[in-house]
Amino acid sequence: MKNEINAVLENMTTTIPEPEDYTGEDGLLYCGKCRKPKEAYFAPDKAAIFGRDRHPAECDCQRTAREEREAAEKRRRHLDTVEELKRRGFTDPTMRDWTFENDNGRNPQTGIARRYVEHWEDMRTDNIGCLFWGGVGTGKSYLAGCIANALMEKEIPVHMTNFALILNDLAASFEGRNEYISRLCRYPLLILDDFGMERGTEYGLEQVFNVIDSRYRSGKPLIVTTNLTLDDLHNPEDTAHSRIYDRLLSMCVPVRFTGDNFRQETAQRKMESMKKLITD
């Protein structure tokens, strides 16, 4: 043990010189590049403790190298964290590509999505969610994914899924319904995509309500995308739908999506590309 302690003390108090280093007039080792000392003298009382009069000091070159190493390590840890968040947070790998950077800029609601991210702390504190509603292919899911990706890049956990998957998971869950729903509610932001497309059985509607109600009680924001209209949501067909929609509208600010069907445009471009390839 004594030898180990001595080895540690030796490492703490000894500087290994580089070929270009030199000894200054004060007797300390200096860096041959930046001309700053690589050693400093102990105070007299400390010198007695360590049995020597000097200890290593950082020159400018060493400080720069250390800061670069620390920055690289910080970047690596950040990338690892974001990768893990996206692995857990997305139920479809293609969602990773739904980013503001990849956006074509044509959706008029992009600004709202960006501001949601910019003001996330306020949204989180005030429990403000969004209900993205509108026609098929108008970019609702894409912008919800942009929000998810942007927040995860800030190391904020987000989960984006849909009720079809949730109902399947609940049916196959070994951890129990309550624990599964509690896990969903632990995410700072939950995004439910394609709401209203799930099967409308009594069991299905009950689980939909349980998830939304649990999220409501958690006090955490929720973003929902749906092809349903506000008229559909304000005029439910029965009591089961009424209590679901009521909870939803109390949590989420409606944002209407209008305009071109981007999926149809993409399909048309692919068709034209195929025609060109097979006719050339």
Question: Predicted regions span which residues?
Answer:
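Walker B catalytic acidic pair
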Residues: D194-F195
